[in-house]
């Protein structure tokens, strides 16, 4: 089913059909990180006799991960995840640095090494391939190179450029990441007027992307689920922002753009 035509003009003078480069967040947009996070935490917690809910897991992750990234922008993502786990473990009543340091470190490594196992959304590969037939496709991701390589093995796409937090030296929502993205797009011959940033997270992507002048397309992957749970999932609350376009899936974005 094609997405509603009124979304194609969005809130700007730029038409979606003007896009020559699409930059993508990966985790939450192309990879179902909430499923991956929840499954991994559940597998770690179960042998300890704990049964945290999905909402509890994601809320704790959202709270702790961003704080660790803010304080340590040059740490690689596995190191970020290990420290995030230590803090989550305390809140979940699992072995932590004070109550069971050795077990906590084993659990932290398991959590940190799980990223390549997180599944891609079912529509990601085909939609990306179709979008790449029309536009350059670029990754702007909050992980390290090795973790993304594992995830990209699931996506099966040869991106035109890949920008990771490890290469940039900071984590979204730092606007520096988006300045680096814009510079890369210019080097590829594409100006901001033909560039759309595509992402699920309002906090990590839409707010900072719009602050540097980018148009944004929201892939609202968790919309109905969020409304039912009254939860923000794995991301913190964002400042008020209105994406220029909104689609429920990447498939819907691809159908819309390729129909023009």
Please provide the spans of the model-predicted regions:
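Residue-level detector of secondary-structure transition/capping positions
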Residues: 45, 65, 132, 185-186
């Amino acid at each position: 089913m094609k997405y509603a035509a009124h979304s194609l003009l969005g809130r700007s003078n730029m038409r979606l059909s003007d896009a020559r480069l699409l930059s993508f967040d990966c985790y939450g947009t192309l990879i179902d990180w909430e499923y991956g996070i929840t499954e991994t935490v559940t597998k770690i917690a179960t042998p300890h006799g704990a049964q945290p809910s999905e909402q509890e897991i994601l809320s704790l992750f959202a709270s702790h991960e961003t704080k660790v990234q803010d304080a340590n922008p040059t740490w690689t993502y596995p190191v970020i995840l290990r420290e995030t786990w230590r803090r989550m473990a305390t809140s979940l009543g699992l072995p932590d640095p004070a109550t069971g340091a050795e077990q906590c470190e084993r659990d932290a490594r398991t959590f940190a090494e799980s990223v390549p196992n997180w599944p891609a959304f079912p529509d990601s590969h085909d939609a990306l391939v179709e979008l790449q037939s029309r536009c350059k496709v670029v990754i702007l991701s909050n992980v390290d190179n090795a973790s993304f390589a594992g995830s990209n093995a699931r996506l099966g796409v040869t991106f035109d450029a890949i920008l990771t937090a490890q290469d940039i030296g900071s984590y979204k929502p730092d606007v520096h990441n988006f300045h680096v993205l814009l510079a890369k797009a210019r080097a590829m011959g594409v100006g901001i007027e033909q560039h759309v940033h595509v992402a699920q997270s309002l906090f990590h992507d839409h707010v900072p992307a719009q602050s540097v002048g980018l148009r944004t397309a929201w892939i609202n992957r968790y919309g109905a689920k969020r409304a039912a749970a009254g939860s923000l999932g794995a991301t913190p609350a964002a400042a008020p922002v209105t994406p220029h376009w909104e689609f429920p899936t990447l498939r819907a974005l691809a159908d819309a753009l390729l129909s023009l």
